[in-house]
């Protein structure tokens, strides 16, 4: 049986692509517009959806407070959003579906930030040590744990997807890519924090496609998913400096002198105390669970699309 899919975070850089990704998998899906934690509003939206008794419905919980800087500046708000309101939203979905004779499933979007810092060159697996450092990561772990306990108590299907880095067009300002583009346009390329850090980035459209594939594969049978946690990652490392270099090539494609000047002005600064110099995931389990390649959008195409989506 194919599940219905309900998801939040529809206006974010990831959520805006989820509907199309679900349609490509022939999954009926609906974005939720109610603010996170508004249980009455969420239940009212669910009342309007044409989901039949005896069906399966999966809720993709992807909304949250994800700016590491904002979480550090306001830890109480981060906890309220990423734990309190998030768990309340998941519980509302479970209560509503069970009361309507629908089998619920939860796909909880978490983060690769939850892992302990690995040795350089080590790819993080689903069994790697969880040891969050930042406020954001700590709230993600607590959210995971509370949703896991709730799902176990209600005997509900749950898959936790720990997404590593995402880049894409139309991301909000606090993400890496729009931040670098703004620096290029403002000529502000000195003292970039964490410039030599190594990360694992996928295009937001690929992440949406992978979440759709996981939803179809893990929840269609109506039984327990074969996994509880899966890393959503490419396994391919890239330095933030290399992303900046590619952006500069694209931005100054017809002006070699300006390109050389811009490159000469680039310098690195220390990252945050909680930053991890190397964070790359192991996609082995993901590869077993999804159809097709993990990456379909090359990084250079992502960068070009981001520049085109945010013209000077």
Where do the protein language model's features map onto the residues?
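Conserved Rossmann-fold NAD(P)-dependent oxidoreductase catalytic core, especially the SDR/UDP-sugar
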Residues: 59, 87-135
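Glycine-rich NAD(P)-binding loop of the Rossmann-fold in SDR/ketoreductase-type enzymes
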Residues: 73, 77-88, 130, 134, ...
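NAD(P)-dependent short-chain dehydrogenase/reductase
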Residues: 145-199, 204-213, 247-248
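C-terminal substrate-binding subdomain of Rossmann-fold SDR/epimerase-dehydratase oxidoreductases
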Residues: 19, 188-312
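Active-site Tyr-X1-5-Lys
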Residues: 95, 117-120, 131-159, 185
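N-terminal Rossmann NAD(P)H-binding glycine-rich loop of SDR-like oxidoreductase domains
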Residues: 3-24
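NAD(P)H-binding glycine-rich loop region in Rossmannoid oxidoreductase-like domains
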Residues: 47-81
């Amino acid at each position: 049986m194919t599940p219905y899919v309900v998801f939040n975070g529809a206006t974010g850089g990831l959520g805006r692509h989820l509907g199309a990704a679900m349609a490509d998998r022939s999954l009926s899906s609906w974005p939720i517009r109610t603010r996170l934690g508004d249980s009455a509003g969420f239940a009212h939206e669910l009342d309007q959806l044409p989901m039949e008794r005896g069906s399966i419905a999966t809720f993709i919980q992807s909304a949250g407070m994800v700016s590491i800087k904002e979480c550090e500046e306001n830890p109480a708000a981060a906890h309220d959003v990423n734990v309190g309101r998030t768990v309340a939203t998941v519980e509302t979905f479970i209560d509503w579906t069970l009361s309507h004779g629908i089998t619920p499933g939860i796909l909880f979007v978490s983060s690769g930030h939850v892992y302990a810092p690995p040795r350089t060159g080590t790819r993080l697996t689903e069994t790697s040590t969880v040891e969050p450092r930042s406020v954001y990561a700590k709230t993600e772990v607590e959210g995971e744990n509370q949703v896991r306990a709730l799902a176990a108590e209600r005997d509900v299907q749950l898959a936790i997807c720990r997404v590593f880095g995402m880049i894409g067009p139309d991301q909000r300002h606090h993400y890496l890519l729009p931040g670098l583009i703004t620096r290029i346009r403002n000529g502000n390329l000195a003292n970039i924090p964490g410039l030599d850090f190594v990360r694992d980035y996928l295009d937001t459209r690929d992440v949406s496609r992978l979440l759709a594939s996981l939803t179809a594969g893990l929840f269609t049978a109506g039984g327990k998913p074969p996994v509880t946690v899966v890393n959503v990652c490419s396994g391919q490392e890239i330095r933030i400096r290399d992303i900046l270099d590619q952006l500069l090539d694209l931005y100054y494609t017809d002006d070699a002198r300006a390109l050389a000047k811009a490159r000469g002005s680039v310098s690195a600064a220390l990252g945050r105390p909680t930053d991890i110099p190397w964070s790359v995931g192991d996609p082995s389990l993901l590869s077993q669970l999804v159809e097709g390649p993990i990456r379909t959008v090359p990084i250079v195409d992502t960068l070009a699309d981001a520049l085109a989506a945010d013209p000077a």
